[in-house]
């Protein structure tokens, strides 16, 4: 049985990428240390109706692609959370998973209104990417009303 003390939750942005997996593990560990819950958020800014309006996709009215995408994403996040919890071990953490449409940075900021900490990954690709944050993490850092942790991608060390 998961113990939950009622403290403000930690919010983590997750999108299935390796970097968001690192952010998820960091957030889970932090939730264990703080004896609080975790809210895993996957935000997306793409829907079948939006794609259809641009002519990219034709979906019959009877086929609810948006619901199927949301459900599949929810299941993928649930698996990632379970794997991360097993990998970390330690105290169980109550986890709420949300898959929400909208601009990722705004969805994360809205989801963190009652949180104590917001955790996001930094995609960092290539030499230039390692020096910059992704657009979502940059927006979140600049507009958040609470502490934000940006978890960097792991960069392999290669001998010179």
Predicted regions located by residue number:
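Glycine-rich, Arg-bearing micro-motifs that act as flexible, cationic patches
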Residues: 117-142, 157-160
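Small/aliphatic-rich secondary-structure junction motif
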Residues: 2-60, 111
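Structural beta-alpha unit
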Residues: 1-6, 19, 33, 82-118, ...
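Short secondary-structure boundary segments
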Residues: 42, 122-123, 152-153
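Acidic, proline/glycine-rich short linear motifs
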Residues: 42-75, 156-160
């Amino acid at each position: 049985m998961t113990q939950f003390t009622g403290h403000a939750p930690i919010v983590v942005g997750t999108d299935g990428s390796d970097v968001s997996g690192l952010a998820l593990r960091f957030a889970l560990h932090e939730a264990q240390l703080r004896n609080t819950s975790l809210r895993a958020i996957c935000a997306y800014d793409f829907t079948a109706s939006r794609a259809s309006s641009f002519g990219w996709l034709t979906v019959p009215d009877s086929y609810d692609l948006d619901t199927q995408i949301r459900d599949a994403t929810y299941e993928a996040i649930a698996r990632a959370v379970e794997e991360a919890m097993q990998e970390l071990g330690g105290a169980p953490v109550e986890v709420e998973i949300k898959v929400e449409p909208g601009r990722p940075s705004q969805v994360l900021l809205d989801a963190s209104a009652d949180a104590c900490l917001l955790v996001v990954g930094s995609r960092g690709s290539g030499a230039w990417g390692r020096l910059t944050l992704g657009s979502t993490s940059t927006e979140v850092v600049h507009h958040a009303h609470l502490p934000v942790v940006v978890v960097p991608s792991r960069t392999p060390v290669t001998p010179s």
